[in-house]
């Protein structure tokens, strides 16, 4: 009887853990006609990120965490710093020093020269960190792909390493979505 109760308790704990994991899975949206398989170069745009704790990374460190995470990507990733350099060479405007709204507008106007799509990361930095990764087509500036990645609930997770880990999950998931679309296109072309 004691063994049965222990077994039931373990099963219940496992079910609760599994339910918790399922509820906290990333939410992915691929828009119709996204053409993710055609994205060979993805530029990182300026993120929507604001520190809520003193020990959190600065915006520049957050951008670096995103770019460092891109090493797991199969797609060629263009850093925000490289985009700023290219735009400054082409237009004479340094998007890193002008007001953010102007910088975003100029980025959107110029990004088509260097990339097939661009990524804007938004970090909801409340009691639980949630990273929203939105990919936009350069020709229309319309969102074609979105991924919501929940993080941990503790303030200890608001650091460079945690943000990099969340961004790595984005790049892996984006690559899988692009591969799935490519396979689907190949299958449709065979038929």
What are these regions (language model features)?
Residues 52-102:
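N-terminal segment of the mature soluble domain
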Residues 1-11:
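Bacterial N-terminal signal peptides that target proteins for export
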Residues 104-114:
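Short, well-structured alpha-helical segments in soluble
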Residues 117-119:
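Well-ordered beta-strand positions
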Residues 48-54, 121-128:
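Short, flexible beta-strand-to-coil junctions
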Residues 38-52, 87-90:
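Acidic/histidine-rich, surface-exposed loop or edge segments in extracytoplasmic proteins
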Residues 9-19:
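Bacterial N-terminal signal peptides
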């Amino acid at each position: 009887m004691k063994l049965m109760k222990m077994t039931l308790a373990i099963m219940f704990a496992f079910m609760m853990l599994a339910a918790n994991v399922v509820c906290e899975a990333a939410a992915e949206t691929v828009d119709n006609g996204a053409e993710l398989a055609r994205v060979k170069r993805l530029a990182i745009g300026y993120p929507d990120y604001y520190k809520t704790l003193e020990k959190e990374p600065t915006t520049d460190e957050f951008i670096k965490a995103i770019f460092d995470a891109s090493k797991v990507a199969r797609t060629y990733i263009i850093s925000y710093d490289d985009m700023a350099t290219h735009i400054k060479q082409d237009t004479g405007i340094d998007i890193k020093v002008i007001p953010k709204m102007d910088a975003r507008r100029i980025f959107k106007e110029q990004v088509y020269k260097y990339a097939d799509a661009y990524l804007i990361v938004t970090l909801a930095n409340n009691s639980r960190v949630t990273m929203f990764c939105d990919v936009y087509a350069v020709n229309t500036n319309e969102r074609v792909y979105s991924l919501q990645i929940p993080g941990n609930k503790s303030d200890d997770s608001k650091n460079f390493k945690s943000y990099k880990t969340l961004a790595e999950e984005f790049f892996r998931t984006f690559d899988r979505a692009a591969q799935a679309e490519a396979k689907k296109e190949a299958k449709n072309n065979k038929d």
